[in-house]
Amino acid sequence: MEASITVLLFAFTKVASSLYYEGSGHSDGEIQTNEVYVESRPLGPYRAPRWCYDLHISDGEATCYSPLGPRYRSTLGTRCRLSCDQGFKLIGQSSVQCLSSRRWSGNGHCRRIQCHVLPPIFYGSYHCSVGVSEGSRCDYSCAPGYMVEGDRSRICMEDGQWSGGEPVCVDLDPPKIQCPVSRMKVAEPEKLTARIFWGNPQVKDSADGVITRVFLRGPEPGSELPEGEHVIRYTAYDRAHNRASCKFIVKVQVRRCPDLTPPLHGYLTCSAAGNNYGATCEYHCEGGYERQGPAARVCQFSQNWAGTPSTCTPMLINVNVNSAGAFIDQFFEKQRLLFISSPSSSDRYYRMQTTALQSSGCGLEQRHVLIVELIGESPREVGRVRNQQLSKELIEELRQVLRISRSYFNMVLIDKHGVDRDRYRQPTASEDIFLFIDTYLLSPRELSQVESNKENCD
């Protein structure tokens, strides 16, 4: 009996050994090193049989359930669920069963989850925590002058895809611009303006260094600028249309002297603005007055007038001259002369004329008209101007030079340049004489004075 049992066991062992063939998942003493492998071990006792070899999965876990209980992991009918560690993905079947053929119904292995390599980003870069593995976080940064637009970080997900979208580096930083310093310049002599120059602004783009346009708002360098403050603005644009502006002030200063006071019985004529640096003011006296002092004064850079003020004093008439020309020349640009000649002081025309002029003294003075009388015939002729008497020789020469008749009444009007302007052979109303003077002889300034003082004369 015992011999029979021994023979049967030996025969069963031979049969069992013949079932181990290549590809069956069984081998003598073999340990597989692939990601899912079967550990070779000899068959245990019958009461703890291992029909299939134990499952091992690299970077994962096999959870098995046997009909005989938790102690049995590879008995016939055992089911195992395969899973992978974090960051790995199962390739193959997720559940296998130990079959009667001593094989597992399938196999699987764990592959590391990886995302594709992110493309480079223009004007920037990215840094990833663990490369392209699952869970890796890639943070984007941009070159100086650029900013990230879009997702600043992307994470490699479990499905092997990156979260979010691909960002870009955009130039949002405006260029740097620095204007020239503000400046002030004194207006040029006799001018209310100054020509001012300045350099170009300093412009730099913090991104790619390219400045496309620079605009100027205001006058150009080298412009002739009037008195006051002028704001100069520059605006620069980079290639991304970002802009930056700066401004500075250009000031033109006009140095001025105190206003001059016109002399009594006189007036001033000034160049430029009248009291600015370099302006010249000339003194003038009204008819019948002479200037005492300098003819002009100049406003200096120190804002003071050169010289001393002038005055206007009554004109001194010199009747002790040797010729008619010398007599008339002393009134040059000072007085107009109205010569009245009559054969006698009792002449009717003479008396009518003098009566009319006596009531028009204000009008004559306003128009700078001085009356010179030549009365009578030689040797009893009389000549006078104001309260001064003329010599007989001067009377005779004046009549000859001016071609004035001794035998009848006549008048001659001489302008301030000694030119014969009009003649009268009959008594003439003062208004008619004044109308001729106002129309043809008065300067615009003199006419304005006559109009402004008209009420005083009336």
Curated annotation (Swiss-Prot):
Residues 1-18 form the signal peptide. GO terms for biological process: angiogenesis; cell-cell adhesion; positive regulation of cell migration involved in sprouting angiogenesis; positive regulation of synapse assembly. Keywords: Angiogenesis, Cell adhesion, Cytoplasm, Disulfide bond, Repeat, Secreted, Signal, Sushi, Synapse. Disulfide bonds join 64-98, 84-110, 115-156, 142-169, 257-299, 285-312. It is found in: Secreted; Cytoplasm; Cell surface; Synapse. InterPro entries: DUF4174 (IPR025232), HYR_dom (IPR003410), SRPX-like (IPR043555), Sushi/SCR/CCP_sf (IPR035976), Sushi_SCR_CCP_dom (IPR000436). It comes from the Eukaryota. PROSITE patterns: HYR, SUSHI. GO terms for molecular function: signaling receptor binding. Residues 62-112, 113-171, 255-314 form the Sushi domain. Residues 170-254 form the HYR domain. Its main location: secreted. GO terms for cellular component: cell surface; cytoplasm; excitatory synapse; extracellular region; synaptic membrane. Pfam families: DUF4174, HYR, Sushi. PANTHER family: HYR DOMAIN-CONTAINING PROTEIN, SUSHI REPEAT-CONTAINING PROTEIN SRPX2. Forms homooligomers. May play a role in angiogenesis, synapse formation, cellular migration and adhesion. This is Sushi repeat-containing protein SRPX2.
